[in-house]
């Protein structure tokens, strides 16, 4: 029994794997060792206490009333065990219900999340629709303004042309008559022109009114839609609020339930731990106690035997001594029984608690495994996300490079366009000057013709303007399409990201399920995969870092090269500096965005497709632009022609200048008033911008205050948490001290009892023990009450802290509401400011209309407008610069604020994550501290919720700021457009002034200023594009951050749900433990009552014990038998333990050992059940004792009834026989258990074989993995080789660029030297006279410099080409890198799919194996049945064959007889006959042939070798030609009469079975005999067949001889025919003889053909001579 107890104790730790203790850190091992030492000390103390109790029990005088006490206690213990089982079942039910409730809650949460996602999507769609409508309105407004500007420019061009024509007409006004006529004509033309202009203005006004009405209508529609959407949103928000309220209530209820369950679970866990400790202690002390008891019993038995020997002598002398001996024996027997019952109870408790311990350890292992696998899954997902982010960064870099290339191409095209415009203007001016010179010599008659032509050309100009407007509209529509495509790209990217997240979640769930299925078998594989992923991630990071560094270095080098090349051009220095600044800023932004922008893989494909579409659109746009440029060139040519013709007419308008001057004065006054208004509007604009800046600063201050307040709250919470942890530690220390005091008090009590024993009498001993026990119970109750009080105090403190936290949360919510109110106020102020801006824009539009009206008068004011134009230019520049500065400052401030807020958020999130990781580590390391850290987790949850709220508020603020920025940009655009219109007006005024002064130099200066303005406009547009790109990048970055926040929240929600599950389990265990404590208290109370009752019953039983003396001897015999059986059981237990040790040595896996130990524990439980049966037998023995008591009473009353007593003894002996039989049954059961163990061993071996199979599969999988790794290594090496090659190319290109730089430096130095020389030459030329001509040296230097400039241009082009080549090579490198990454990902996916397929194949193979087994069994059954059927059918066929054999034999006999007669007749005939005598049998043969065979055609039958005119020895007739029947054919045609007779004879009579059997035997014998005869006949048949062949050959020879004799008879006729054939000339007569020859000779078709050719005369005479002479000798038969 000692070994069994020790094995039961050691079984629990052996089930757990040893690797986990080895993997623990040093601190945890030290803690674990300390805990084990504490447990050992407690066990030792408990052992000492139990030893003391045993000694006390031994020293006590045992009364007879203990039996009833033991019965009651056993019954109570049984009831307690039943209650424990019931409580366990209730716990299981509660767990199942809890799981169901959790599932329902998760389902409801998923539904709510889905509804929230749907609502968010609908809200996003509404917002996008609103933005699209706004964009459309803005586009319409911009189109309207562009149309206005175009019309204004056309009007200005017409005015300029009129002014130029007037100037030209002044110079040619020679005669007054011509001038008068021209003035009249010009007045008519001007009236018509003014009418046309008025009509155009009216049309413009009408179109503007219509557009305004449309805009108003669209605004109304937008407002209606906005109201409708707001109503829908409000309804949805109300529904969401209701759902949230219901969800919160449900969650609160569930949380309350979970808390209660968690508390109960914690209590139960603590109780179970205590019980486990106590049971371990008791299990260790039980074997020692049992040894002590067994030794004491042996001593007692020895003493008792000696005393019995003594007493037997004394009893013979004294009857009183005999009575005392019997009393002592009874006392010893009672003590024995009590000890045995206690031993069995302790055994049951030990086994039960061991089972509980194993269950709890398995649960803990399961929880740890689940946590470990979840952690691995999260790490795997993180690696996947990092890979996706890196891939997306590469794609973004590609798109940026492509965009930069497109921008460069656009800049080049714009520059080329500007150059072409300049060339056309110069050409136009030259043509105007030439036409003006030629026009002076023209005649007056051409003027009238030109007038008509001018009218036609005006109409053509109008048509061309309409066409130009259509082209502009098409271009704007294309731009709108591009913008729509960009918006659609953004939307599709969002949708794709959502779909990718859902796909990720689905994949994560699928992967989680697969991992749960395959964790036991593929742990090593998971470790390998983790290492592979880590190495791949590091490799990719290193590659990306190397690529980024190389790219940065190459980019910097290229930028430096570009700056050096562009520095050589002096005119573009300023542009290069600005571009370098922009490029540096873009590079910094690029580095930032590369680290931040990381999206999914599927977006890459969509972006590539859309990029291709955009390229196609850009190509189409370029083609359209080229067409427009061609159209513009054609228009310019026409305009040049028209201007030449209009020059003559416009000279007559010189007189109208005086009137125009008067009107110009009025215009100047109006313009001054307008300038004052513009100044006031700009001041209002500045004021509004300053207010915006103040509002943004206030918002930043509020945000900073809020963050500071949150940080203070967090610090306070952390301090409170530290205080709580310290208090918890103090309470734990107090509890430990109290437990030590309890143990000390118990030891003192036991010592006190030992001291008091000798002085107290036997009667008073029991009362003192009861009093001490009561005092101990009362002390225990007080201690428990103190424990409960402490727990309640701790709970109250926790509640107070929770209340404080809630108050702080409410305060934070109030602060958030206040901040939101401030934000709303600021938004309202912004709305008011926007309204004011709208009013200002309306006033601006009105002013623009006024300006349009005043433009007609502006044409006359030329001299006084110079001062005004300068003032207006200065004002416009200053205002434009101020606006740009303010807008840039605002944008910079907003971006900095956004960056600061995002950095703060990221830092907070990192802090929270760090705290969560610390909590996880602490939970993993110390599971006993989980209950204490619940408050920490709750507070962290609250912090995270508050941070999430802050992030949401900040996101809303950021979105609002974005909207404000977009509006500000739009306002900037409108302001810039207005400034451009003002500049265009100023330029027109300057051009008018220049033309009035008639100086071409001033006109050229105006054109140059116009070019500068266009360049500035291009710069501003580029700046706008850059700012738009920055805004888009920031938006993408914010979207990525929001996605990361969502992912982190999802992970946090999962962790919180896991923590809640753990809390619920702990609470249920606590509740169970509390219930058990209450039950124990009730049992203790009942125990006290029972002890009192036992004391009363003891007095009654002392009298009855004296009567049991007679039955003690029989009981002793039974006890001896019982001990023997116990020894046998111990032997069996030892054997089982040996078997267990052998199994432990042989087994390979710890889990299988644990299963085997569980089975062994079940067997132990069965043994304990057997022990309980034995106890039942003992109870039956007690019942027999009661019967014996009744017999003793009868003995006192009736001593004479001894015979009746003997009968009762016989009955008792029968009962003993029954018990022996039951013991034999128990032995048989033990043998059955041994057989079960053997079967289990067989199953273990089978499972080991399966494990080996699985190992083989694992080895195969690992080999495949190694192959894949090698393939990956080879691909990586190839990639590195390509990278090295490309790096070498880059180095070569860098060297070329350096050489180019050196050459450029040399050229620049030469150019500077040339400048110095030119400067010196110019100084010398100034000193010389003006009349001297230029020297030839200067011309040579100029030519040399022009050559150098051409060479430099060529070098620049070469460098640009090399740059383009390097860029293309870089793109190819990137594409190859992307393809390699895709291959790598495909390989990973293929490995995963292959694993899944192999597993599916395994499952399918197993299922197919089972199916094949079942099919094999079915086919075996079917084959057996078929075999039986075939046997029967073959028997029937054999019978039929035997019958047919008989028939054939009879027919053959008849045929043989016939054949023999025929042969005899043939032999009797003579072999050689004369021709006359042989003619008769030939006739008979022929007649026979005619009857048997069909008629033969002589034409169709071919000759054989011996036929014709050859000898008679050779055979000429073929077997097919003769058709002689063979012997087999003759035999197969029997007589019908004989067949009928045989059939009639066979089927005539029916016989009995016996007769049939006799006939069968006789027929078999006859069949054998007939078989022999058949063989003999077959041999004779063969001989006969040979003879028949000889006879046939002879018959054929004779027939041929007869035929030849016939032919010899016909020789004379044939001779005559042949002679005629020979001697006739070739022609028709010969051809007539051919059929006769054919019938006579029976020619073959080939011979016929030859004769036909001879008859026609184609053969020669030589062929004739070799005709039939050779046949004559053979026919005679002499050869």
Swiss-Prot record:
Alphabetical list of Gene3D superfamilies matching this protein: GRIP domain
Region (Mediates interaction with RAB9A): 1569-1679
Subunit structure: Homodimer. Interacts (via GRIP domain) with RAB6A (preferentially in its GTP-bound form). May interact (RAB6A-dependent) with ARL1; might be involved in GCC2 Golgi localization. Interacts with CLASP1 and CLASP2; recruits both proteins to membranes of the TGN. Interacts with STX16. Interacts (probably via GRIP domain) with RAB9A (preferentially in its GTP-bound form).
Region of interest: Disordered: 1-23, 1466-1522
Modification N-acetylmethionine, positions: 1
Predominant location: cytoplasm
Protein task: Golgin which probably tethers transport vesicles to the trans-Golgi network (TGN) and regulates vesicular transport between the endosomes and the Golgi. As a RAB9A effector it is involved in recycling of the mannose 6-phosphate receptor from the late endosomes to the TGN. May also play a role in transport between the recycling endosomes and the Golgi. Required for maintenance of the Golgi structure, it is involved in the biogenesis of noncentrosomal, Golgi-associated microtubules through recruitment of CLASP1 and CLASP2.
UniProt xrefs under SMART domains: Grip (SM00755)
Protein name in UniProt: GRIP and coiled-coil domain-containing protein 2
Cell compartment(s), UniProt: Cytoplasm; Golgi apparatus, trans-Golgi network membrane
Region of interest called Mediates interaction with RAB6A, as start-end residue ranges on this chain: 1569-1608
Domain GRIP, residue spans: 1604-1654
Membrane topology classification: Peripheral membrane protein
An annotated GO BP: retrograde transport, endosome to Golgi
KW Acetylation (keyword) present: yes
Keyword Ribonucleoprotein: no
Description of its domains: Extended rod-like protein with coiled-coil domains.
Positions of modified residues (Phosphoserine): 1474, 1478
GO CC entries: cytosol; Golgi apparatus; membrane; trans-Golgi network
GO molecular function: identical protein binding
Coiled coil: 35-1469
Pfam families to which the protein is assigned, alphabetical: GRIP, Rab_bind
Keywords for the protein's UniProt record, in alphabetical order: Acetylation, Coiled coil, Cytoplasm, Golgi apparatus, Membrane, Phosphoprotein, Protein transport, Transport
Biased composition (Polar residues): 1474-1483
PANTHER family, sorted: GRIP AND COILED-COIL DOMAIN-CONTAINING PROTEIN 2, NUCLEAR MITOTIC APPARATUS PROTEIN 1-RELATED
């Amino acid at each position: 029994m000692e070994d069994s107890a020790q094995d039961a104790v050691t079984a629990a730790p052996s089930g757990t794997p040893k690797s986990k203790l080895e993997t623990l850190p040093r601190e945890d091992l030290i803690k674990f060792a300390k805990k084990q030492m504490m447990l050992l000390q407690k066990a030792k103390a408990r052992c000492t206490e139990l030893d003391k109790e045993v000694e006390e029990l031994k020293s006590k005088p045992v009364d007879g009333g203990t039996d009833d006490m033991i019965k009651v206690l056993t019954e109570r213990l049984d009831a307690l065990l039943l209650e424990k089982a019931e409580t366990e079942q209730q716990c299981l039910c509660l767990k199942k219900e809890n799981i169901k409730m959790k599932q329902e809650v998760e389902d409801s949460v998923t539904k709510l999340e889905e509804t929230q996602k749907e609502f968010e999507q609908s809200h996003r769609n509404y917002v996008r629709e609103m933005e699209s409508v706004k964009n459309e309105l803005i586009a319409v407004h911009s189109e309207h303004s562009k149309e206005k500007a175009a019309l204004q420019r056309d009007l200005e061009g017409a005015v300029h042309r009129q002014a130029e024509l007037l100037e030209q007409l002044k110079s040619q006004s020679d005669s007054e008559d011509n001038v008068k006529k021209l003035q009249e004509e010009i007045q008519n033309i001007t009236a018509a022109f003014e009418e046309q202009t008025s009509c155009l203005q009216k049309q413009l006004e009408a179109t503007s009114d219509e557009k305004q009405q449309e805009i108003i209508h669209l605004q109304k529609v937008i407002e209606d839609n906005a109201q409708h959407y707001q109503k829908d949103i409000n309804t949805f928000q109300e529904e969401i609020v209701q759902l949230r309220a219901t969800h919160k209530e449900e969650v609160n209820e569930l949380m309350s339930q979970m808390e209660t369950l968690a508390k109960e679970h914690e209590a139960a866990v603590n109780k179970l731990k205590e019980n486990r400790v106590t049971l371990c202690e008791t299990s260790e002390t039980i074997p020692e106690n049992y040894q002590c008891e067994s030794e004491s019993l042996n001593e007692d038995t020895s003493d008792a035997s000696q005393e019995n020997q003594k007493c037997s002598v004394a009893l013979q002398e004294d009857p009183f001594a005999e009575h005392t001996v019997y009393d002592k024996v009874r006392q010893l027997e009672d003590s024995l029984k009590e000890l045995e019952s206690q031993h069995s109870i302790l055994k049951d408790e030990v086994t039960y608690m061991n089972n509980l311990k194993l269950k709890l350890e398995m649960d803990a292992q399961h929880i740890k495994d689940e946590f470990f696998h979840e952690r691995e899954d999260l790490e795997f997902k993180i690696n996947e996300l990092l890979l996706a982010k890196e891939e997306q960064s590469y794609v973004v870099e590609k798109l940026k490079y492509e965009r930069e290339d497109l921008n460069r191409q656009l800049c080049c095209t714009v520059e080329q366009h500007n150059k072409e415009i300049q060339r056309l203007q110069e050409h136009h001016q030259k043509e105007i000057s030439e036409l003006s010179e030629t026009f002076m010599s023209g005649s007056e008659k051409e003027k009238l013709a030109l007038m008509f032509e001018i009218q036609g050309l005006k109409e053509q100009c109008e048509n061309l303007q309409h066409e130009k407007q259509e082209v502009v509209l098409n271009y704007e529509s294309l731009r709108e399409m591009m913008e729509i495509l960009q918006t659609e790209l953004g939307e599709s990217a969002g949708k794709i990201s959502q779909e990718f997240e859902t796909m990720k979640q689905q994949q994560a769930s699928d992967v989680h399920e697969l991992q749960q299925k395959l964790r036991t078998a593929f742990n090593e594989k998971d470790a390998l995969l983790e290492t592979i992923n880590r190495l791949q991630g590091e490799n990719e990071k290193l590659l990306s870092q190397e690529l980024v560094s190389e790219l940065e270095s190459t980019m910097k080098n290229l930028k430096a090269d570009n700056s050096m090349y562009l520095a050589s051009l002096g005119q573009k220095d300023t542009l290069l500096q600005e571009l370098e600044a922009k490029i540096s800023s873009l590079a910094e932004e690029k580095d930032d965005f590369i680290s931040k922008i990381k999206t999914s893989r599927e977006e890459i494909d969509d972006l590539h497709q859309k990029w291709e579409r955009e390229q196609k659109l850009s190509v189409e746009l370029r083609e359209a632009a080229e067409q427009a440029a061609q159209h513009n060139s054609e228009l310019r040519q026409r305009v040049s022609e028209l201007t030449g013709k209009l020059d003559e007419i416009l000279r007559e308008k010189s007189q109208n200048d005086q009137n125009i001057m008067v009107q110009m004065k009025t215009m100047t006054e109006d313009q001054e008033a307008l300038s004052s208004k513009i100044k006031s509007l700009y001041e209002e604009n500045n004021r509004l911008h300053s207010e915006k800046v103040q509002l943004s600063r206030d918002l930043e201050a509020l945000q900073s205050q809020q963050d500071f307040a949150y940080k203070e709250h967090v610090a306070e919470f952390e301090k409170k948490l530290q205080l709580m942890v310290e208090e918890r530690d103090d309470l734990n220390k107090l509890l430990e001290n109290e437990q030590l005091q309890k143990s000390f008090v118990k030891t003192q009590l036991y010592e006190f009892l030992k001291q008091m024993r000798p002085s107290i009498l036997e009667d008073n001993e029991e009362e003192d023990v009861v009093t001490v026990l009561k005092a101990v119970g009362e002390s225990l109750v007080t201690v428990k009450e103190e424990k409960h009080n402490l727990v309640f105090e701790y709970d109250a403190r926790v509640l107070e802290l929770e209340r404080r936290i809630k108050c702080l949360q409410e305060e934070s919510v109030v602060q958030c509401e206040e901040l939101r109110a401030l934000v709303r106020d600021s938004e309202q102020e912004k709305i008011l400011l926007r309204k004011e801006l709208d009013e200002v824009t309306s006033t601006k539009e009105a002013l623009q209309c006024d300006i349009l009206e005043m433009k007609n008068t502006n044409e006359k004011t030329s001299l006084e407008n110079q001062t005004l134009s300068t003032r207006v230019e200065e004002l416009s520049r200053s205002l434009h610069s101020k606006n740009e500065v303010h807008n840039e400052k605002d944008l910079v401030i907003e971006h900095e604020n956004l960056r600061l807020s995002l950095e703060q958020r990221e830092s907070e999130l990192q802090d929270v994550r760090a705290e969560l990781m610390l909590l996880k580590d602490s939970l993993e390391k110390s599971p006993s501290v989980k209950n204490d850290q619940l408050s920490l987790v709750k507070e962290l949850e609250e912090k995270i919720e508050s941070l999430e709220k802050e992030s949401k508020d900040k996101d809303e603020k950021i979105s609002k700021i974005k909207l404000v920025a977009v509006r500000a940009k739009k306002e900037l655009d409108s302001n810039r457009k207005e400034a451009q219109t003002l500049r265009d007006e100023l330029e027109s005024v300057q051009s008018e002034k220049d033309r009035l002064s008639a100086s071409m130099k001033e006109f050229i200066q105006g054109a140059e200023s116009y070019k500068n303005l266009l360049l500035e406009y291009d710069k501003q547009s580029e700046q706008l594009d850059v700012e738009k790109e920055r805004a888009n990048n920031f938006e993408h970055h914010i979207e990525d951050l929001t996605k990361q926040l969502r992912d982190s929240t999802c992970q946090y929600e999962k962790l919180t749900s896991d923590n809640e599950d753990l809390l619920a389990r702990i609470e249920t265990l606590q509740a169970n433990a509390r219930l058990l404590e209450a039950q124990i208290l009730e049992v203790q109370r009942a125990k006290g009552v029972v002890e009192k009752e036992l004391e009363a019953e003891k007095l009654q039983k002392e009298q009855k014990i004296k009567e049991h003396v007679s039955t003690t001897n029989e009981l002793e015999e039974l006890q001896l038998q019982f001990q023997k059986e116990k020894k046998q059981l111990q032997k069996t237990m030892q054997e089982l333990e040996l078997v267990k040790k052998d199994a432990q040595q042989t087994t390979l896996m710890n889990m299988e050992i644990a299963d085997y130990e569980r089975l062994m524990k079940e067997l132990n439980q069965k043994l304990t059940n057997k022990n309980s049966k034995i106890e039942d037998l003992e109870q039956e023995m007690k019942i027999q004792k009661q019967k014996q008591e009744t017999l003793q009473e009868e003995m006192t009353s009736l001593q004479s009834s001894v015979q009746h007593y003997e009968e009762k003894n016989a009955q008792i002996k029968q009962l003993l026989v029954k018990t022996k039989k039951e013991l034999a049954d128990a032995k048989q059961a033990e043998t059955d258990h041994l057989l079960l163990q053997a079967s289990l061993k067989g199953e273990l071996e089978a499972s080991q074989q399966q494990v080996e199979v699985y190992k083989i599969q694992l080895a195969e999988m690992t080999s495949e993995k190694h192959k894949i790794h090698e393939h990956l290594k080879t691909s990586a090496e190839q990639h590195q080789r390509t990278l090295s090659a490309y790096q070498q190319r880059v180095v070569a290109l860098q060297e070329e660029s350096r050489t180019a730089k050196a050459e450029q430096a040399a050229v620049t130095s030469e150019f500077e030297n040339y400048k110095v020389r030119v400067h010196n030459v110019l100084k010398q030329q100034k000193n010389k006279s003006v009349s001297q001509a230029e020297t030839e040296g200067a011309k040579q230097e100029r030519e040399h410099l022009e050559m150098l400039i051409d060479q430099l241009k060529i070098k620049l082009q070469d460098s640009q080409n090399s740059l383009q080549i390097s860029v293309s090579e870089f793109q190819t490198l990137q594409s190859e890198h992307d393809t390699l990454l895709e291959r790598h990902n495909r390989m990973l996916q293929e490995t995963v799919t292959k694993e899944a397929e192999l597993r599916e194949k395994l499952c399918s193979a197993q299922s197919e194996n089972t199916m094949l087994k079942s099919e094999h069994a079915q086919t075996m059954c079917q084959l057996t049945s078929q075999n039986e059927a075939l046997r029967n059918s073959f028997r029937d066929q054999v019978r039929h064959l035997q019958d047919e054999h008989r028939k054939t034999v009879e027919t053959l006999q008849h045929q043989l007889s016939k054949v023999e007669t025929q042969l005899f007749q043939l032999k009797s005939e003579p072999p050689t006959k004369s021709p006359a005598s042989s003619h008769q049998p030939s006739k008979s043969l022929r007649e026979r042939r005619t009857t048997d065979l069909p008629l033969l055609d002589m034409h169709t039958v071919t000759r054989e070798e011996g036929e014709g005119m050859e000898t008679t020895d050779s055979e000429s007739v073929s077997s097919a030609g003769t058709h002689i029947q063979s012997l087999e054919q003759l035999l197969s045609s029997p007589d019908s009469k004989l067949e009928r007779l045989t059939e009639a004879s066979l089927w005539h009579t029916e016989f009995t079975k016996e007769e049939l059997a006799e006939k069968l035997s006789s027929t078999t014998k006859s069949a054998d005999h007939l078989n022999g005869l058949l063989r003999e006949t077959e041999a004779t048949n063969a001989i006969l067949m040979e003879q028949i062949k000889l006879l046939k050959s002879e018959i054929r020879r004779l027939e041929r001889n007869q035929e030849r004799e016939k032919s010899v008879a016909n020789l004379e006729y044939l001779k005559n025919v042949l002679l005629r054939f020979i001697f006739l000339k070739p022609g028709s007569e010969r051809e007539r003889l051919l059929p006769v020859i054919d019938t006579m000779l029976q020619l073959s078709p080939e011979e016929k053909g030859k004769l036909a050719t001879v008859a026609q005369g184609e053969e020669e005479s030589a062929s004739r001579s070799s005709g039939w002479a050779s046949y004559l000798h053979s026919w005679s038969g002499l050869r």
